[in-house]
Amino acid sequence: MTVDYKNTLNLPETSFPMRGDLAKREPDMLKNWYEKNLYQKIRKASKGKKSFILHDGPPYANGNIHIGHAVNKILKDIIIKSKTALGFDSPYIPGWDCHGLPIELKVEGLVGKPNEKISAAEFRQKCREYAAEQVEGQKKDFIRLGVLGDWDNPYLTMNFDTEANIIRTLGKVIENGHLYKGSKPVHWCLDCGSSLAEAEVEYEDKVSPSIYVRFPAESADEIEAKFSAQGRGQGKLSAIIWTTTPWTMPSNRAIAVNADLEYNLVQLGDERVILAAELVESVAKAVGIEHIEILGSVKGDDLELSRFHHPFYDFTVPVILGDHVTTDGGTGLVHTAPDHGLDDFIVGKQYDLPMAGLVSNDGKFISTTEFFAGKGVFEANPLVIEKLQEVGNLLKVEKIKHSYPHCWRHKTPIIFRATPQWFIGMETQGLRQQALGEIKQVRWIPDWGQARIEKMVENRPDWCISRQRTWGVPMTLFVHKETEELHPRTLDLLEEVAKRVERAGIQAWWDLDEKELLGADAETYRKVPDTLDVWFDSGSTYSSVVANRPEFNGQNIDMYLEGSDQHRGWFMSSLMLSTATDSKAPYKQVLTHGFTVDGQGRKMSKSIGNIVTPQEVMDKFGGDILRLWVASTDYTGEMTVSDEILKRAADSYRRIRNTARFLLANLNGFDPKRDLVKPEEMVSLDRWAVACALDAQNEIKDAYDNYQFHTVVQRLMRFCSVEMGSFYLDIIKDRQYTTKADSLARRSCQTALWHIAEALVRWMAPILSFTADEIWQHLPQTESARAEFVFTEEFYQGLFGLGEDEKLDDAYWQQLIKVRSEVNRVLEISRNNKEIGGGLEAEVTVYANDEYRALLAQLGNELRFVLITSKVDIKSLSEKPADLADSELEGIAVSVTRSNAEKCPRCWHYSDEIGVSPEHPTLCARCVENVVGNGEVRHFA
């Protein structure tokens, strides 16, 4: 009768499932996390540790989250969790940006414009309610990603206390002398009816008219004299400008030239024109005239204050000097309309040029505009061209495709328009230079971010912080009705209003009667009707939120982390405000990630049909697969995602999960309190495996500390697939399954597996949070009660390295891995040739040089367990048969023959020692010892 020895084996057993089934299991885990107040438990466990503060850049409270939101929140969550594991107290307070035009437009669509069907106060309340609904919707999706934070107490820019603190930040800006009021060209959206911040402007291709325009000289004789060209040439004499915005011609008040450039008086066909010397040929070619003659040359400086007739109005304009004039294109003479261009405005101010003020808020010419009254600016383009042709001052017209500013919300072209606005001055109190100095104190990740934001700060205009909107934090200022000067008690008044807003929200300002605060001054002072730019809202959260939340304990902010578009947006507005109020940058480190594109590198769009939504990914693959994709992608560039890429992430996930499952299954019955083996008593290979885990942990900790999450994933995969899966875990199966359950040989192995599992689950937790939690619940209990959640724990402290006196050190095992790899290669050839079925069916002879012979001999009879064959002979390389193929590893050669021995049904090894025990005639001697004896002894493997 055949005896079944299966029950004498230590077969792996665990309730940890092979399949993750993440999409189904994760929601239940989330429910458990929140029912048990996991975030608060992390806070309690971290109390008193050194702080690391990552301040959440608030997403806009409108619409569903997209894949870019998911990337951003997951990266933040990985950092927060890894910092906790590294021993920091790292709170996470999520936030939302709640004021501004997109919400206004949505609410307008629902209830109509304010002061039409609904009062402004009711409209603001509807905006507040709409924003709150949007926050709740986005919050659920963020939580589903596995992001841990104080979701019950997020910061909202529309919270009454935050609105009040935003007003207080404005007070600090004023106190430090950075605010001024001026009429200045700002980005103006005709659809919004409001100014736009730099970050709200996108550049898209647009087809515009391209025109060359004549400005006839007031005195041709005077110009001839300047060029020393009296009596030379013929025809009328004009300055030529080029523009792609014909509608700005009615507002022209000057022609700008560069003082240092050379200008020519040119005979161009039958007329004389002034052009920059470098551009004469290109202009002649553009207007289609071959006959040109240079009549004279002067520096731009010599043309200053020469006068030319406006092309179609009855006044003359001066030539002025400006450094912004270049020879990159055009004519070298720049049409200057101070209302409609920042350079024009700046240079116009130096010459005291008048502002035309011809374009109203809705983008139409005012009623007194000759020829174009009531026309929209873009509607006026062909009319201006027609007028220029009519009066004979159009030299050339054509179409040009060029990059043009558009509103990021409406995707429509915008204009520059001078309006009375409130500004934070970049030059007042040295703000620009101070900000540039602060940038150098910050660590920028990746480092090119520093040069990028430096260039932006160097070139940015004064910040227009006022908006003409209904739903926003009001600029709670009182100005003199005639002089527009701020009230002398502005700072005290701001604080009084802030207290009211703290109690009742921003509506408290709109409900306020001036007399309540101003008394008799109400006769001469009025309330400013403007609201603050929403970038002021979010840009001030370093103060309005972080400085006031008890969790942050007054600490400085360590990190801002957002997409690379935020150099121009949140990073910029925060830097400007913090420098203006506190003379320092608000952050120590700034990390930026790239945009998400499809597998072909294309931007996601509905028209292409390549949009990947986080909701779909989680429903199909689960949150951990999405998290693993984020972590494994180099975030410093564009982040590619597609179904195929996510499937690859799922494959990687399975390898990690299978490793964890193997560990747990082989820890079945292991009680660390009872069974843990001291390092010095462990089998050599087990000590090496723990040391290998320590090396991996050190690299993983360093990668987490430097935000190199793709390196974490690569190291995790190498550990699971190569060092463990392809080597250690493969080798120990025999010892784990066949030795006596409580033998030192097996307990040594389980001790190593336990240490590795304790470390592995912590490495995974910041990235594969759901799976780490699942593993944590299946780990054996320790002497002290195991913490309820892995997320409260620091990286594992129980790993140990190899001692200096360790003979079988890491270098030894690395050499052995090479030998094993070569043996496996030869075994594979034999398998493919049908000479053997598996490695245990083989008897291997290794012909080795002296170095390798000494190396292999150290394992004695246990070498076969490392090579996973039934028998190994070691011979001198000089004995290698002549017909044996050379090895790919220099210094050894390998031959394989099929074993003629019998197969043991218990361990599957082929052995000459089967039948040594009459009671167990089918077992090999080793299995007899393990079944009825004291158990097999292992020293090395």
From Swiss-Prot:
A motif ('KMSKS' region) lies at residues 603-607. Signal peptide: none annotated. L-isoleucyl-5'-AMP binds at residue 562. The keyword Nucleotide-binding applies. One of its GO terms (molecular function) is zinc ion binding. Keywords: Aminoacyl-tRNA synthetase, ATP-binding, Cytoplasm, Ligase, Metal-binding, Nucleotide-binding, Protein biosynthesis, Zinc. A motif ('HIGH' region) lies at residues 59-69. It is found in: Cytoplasm. Its cofactor is Zn(2+). Zn(2+) binds at residues 904, 907, 924, 927. Binds 1 zinc ion per subunit. It catalyses: tRNA(Ile) + L-isoleucine + ATP = L-isoleucyl-tRNA(Ile) + AMP + diphosphate. Catalyzes the attachment of isoleucine to tRNA(Ile). As IleRS can inadvertently accommodate and process structurally similar amino acids such as valine, to avoid such errors it has two additional distinct tRNA(Ile)-dependent editing activities. One activity is designated as 'pretransfer' editing and involves the hydrolysis of activated Val-AMP. The other activity is designated 'posttransfer' editing and involves deacylation of mischarged Val-tRNA(Ile). IleRS has two distinct active sites: one for aminoacylation and one for editing. The misactivated valine is translocated from the active site to the editing site, which sterically excludes the correctly activated isoleucine. The single editing site contains two valyl binding pockets, one specific for each substrate (Val-AMP or Val-tRNA(Ile)). Belongs to the class-I aminoacyl-tRNA synthetase family. IleS type 1 subfamily. Monomer. This is Isoleucine--tRNA ligase. It comes from Haemophilus influenzae (strain PittGG). The lineage of its organism: Bacteria, Pseudomonadati, Pseudomonadota, Gammaproteobacteria, Pasteurellales.
